[in-house]
């Protein structure tokens, strides 16, 4: 049997975020939360591993208390247990601190063979939590895996790197982050959704996990967020087509888009 933990992130729905016209800052108040899309691929792969080799599938997330309800989506997919790691200062924590909390939570679960996560989160897409977590747990890891073949002794992970396909063999315990191409996450039915709404979610705080406040002091603080403002130039040539084409070519050369213009 393979004991598997899926590490998921509950974050804002980036498709619903709007920008303040005056400050160019994102308006996050009132934006709904969602499970990061890539983490549903991780859950699907965990469930396929369970179907093949047995074991239990659990999900762990670190986030605000509001993340509880979104965890139920992963329970509905098939997770048998769900754990929420939170802290009063959660919004101030950096990746290193969150990694320490998640590592402590996974260790508290006991014997774990396989940790799966999405390649990155949909909000910041840094892709650093998987390697950080593997380092904190002291286990081998591979990121951006597009094909996973687990067996009783370990797993084979395949990923694309440029023009190459790399294949790795890892023993258990191991941590793997997965790309969206690896599978198509299942959609739970109504009975599974209703059943998930009744299952308990265990909540752990930093002190519960034995993580001291000093260990959570952020080394990096987010100073601010601003949207990128794209300025478009609408240049119209109202001449006859041959003359308009000539002016267009001259304009593109002047901008350095075509050869023969400014550098």
Predicted regions and their residues:
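N-terminal glycine-rich FAD/FM-binding segment characteristic of electron-transfer flavoproteins
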Residues: 1-263
